[in-house]
Amino acid sequence: MRVLVSNDDGVDAPGIQILAEALRRAGHEVMVVAPDRDRSGASNSLTLDVPIRTRRIDAQTCAVAGTPTDCVHLALTGMLDYDPDIVVSGINNSANLGDDVIYSGTVSAAMEGRFLGLPAVAVSLVTQNHEAHHFETAARAAVEIVARLKADPLPADTILNVNVPDLAWADVLGFEVTRLGNRHRSEPCVPQSDPRGRTVYWIGPAGPEQDAGAGTDFHAVRTGHISITPIHVDLTRYQALDTVAGWVGGLTAALDAPA
């Protein structure tokens, strides 16, 4: 298969290099199109106000001065001279569990692939303090999942969010299909002073686990399993449709009220 690989940790990150090499060893044709620096937390942002510069590192690698979503968008809308078959994003050097997917550039790169018509997988290694020891485990998991997707495709609106415990392959207890868990609200932002005495802020850490019981991605990884969460991008809250529909009469009447 022709595999487009991207990430949010940057084109020089070890995770993406190990992933690309593992996919090549498995017989895939791999093109890496990734940010020229760390763009973690970029979510689904596209660069629309300035042109995006790219730099070919070699025949199989391109660095992009943009977000993960920019990378996949450019690669799939004309920058490459061929059409990939699948998008694989990662390997992220930290978890993308539960609410993390909202902010994750890793997941968003996969999501852009899905928007543009390709199967897509996001792969993250659940590390402690970003100190990764077993990228090769996550890479092997990705290779196995890509093979399964080729043999048994999923519905066209499905993205796979994969989180891998930072363990040797032999120590992983298995794969689990999971749902997204939830975190408590984020920790407070951290104020500091710059050299001129002006207040600046750091975004605080993600909140601790809240909904993290059996069946969630949090629980699977915590118990030594590789979590596979099928996700999609329909954000409609169907359970609220009837309630909001009940507002419509009053809202419509307000159109006739004096300004």
Curated annotation (Swiss-Prot):
Similarity-based family: Belongs to the SurE nucleotidase family.
Cofactor descriptive note: Binds 1 divalent metal cation per subunit.
Hydrolase keyword on record: yes
EC number annotated for this UniProt entry: 3.1.3.5
SUPFAM superfamilies according to UniProt: SurE-like
Secretion signal span: none
Residues reported to bind a divalent metal cation: D8, D9, S40, N92
GO cellular component entries: cytoplasm
Gene3D superfamilies assigned: Survival protein SurE-like phosphatase/nucleotidase
Keywords: Cytoplasm, Hydrolase, Metal-binding, Nucleotide-binding
Requisite cofactors: a divalent metal cation
GO molecular function terms attached to this record: 3'-nucleotidase activity; 5'-nucleotidase activity; exopolyphosphatase activity; metal ion binding; nucleotide binding
Presence of the UniProt keyword Hydrolase in the record: yes
Subcellular location: Cytoplasm
Xref: InterPro entries: SurE, SurE-like_Pase/nucleotidase, SurE-like_sf
Pfam family, one: SurE
Enzyme class of the recorded protein, top EC level: hydrolase
Taxonomic superkingdom: Bacteria
The protein's name in its UniProt record: 5'-nucleotidase SurE
